[in-house]
């Protein structure tokens, strides 16, 4: 504690924060404390987003934090606050998106790596890398150096990490006049079972009762 207080925080934090949906937390008082103490809190969000914010607050002014976590925050509505948090702080140094590449054999989660600091950058761009396949550990640094591109993210849109050709195409599509008035369409979540374990079963279970 003395060293922590003397330095004003940690020099480096490396973490794999827990993934847990906030809406599953039944303790209302605990949930209210989270809402009152975290800027990126969203009632439909996930605890890992709060861990990212907390990690930054535990750093000293020159500290760096690196986290491997879910990549859902890049595009989901509950990730809006976290994305804007990064943009306002201008502290996101590097972002790696593994898409559907299986990183953990024991966990079914699409992952990303976040590297950030408490110091503001001199640019609005973020160094980004997209992985579509598993590569050898020895080739990781080389792959990142060869395939990273600088992306300027918008506070109003989901974040897409792709190659320059794809990003340029997306920009062109955004600039096409909206003749169909698509902004009037409201797309919401589809039907929910309410209890997946009861309604989504393997083929073996129906055979037992037939």
Q: Each predicted region: which residue ranges?
A:
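Signature of N6-adenine DNA methyltransferases within the class I
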Residues: 3-209
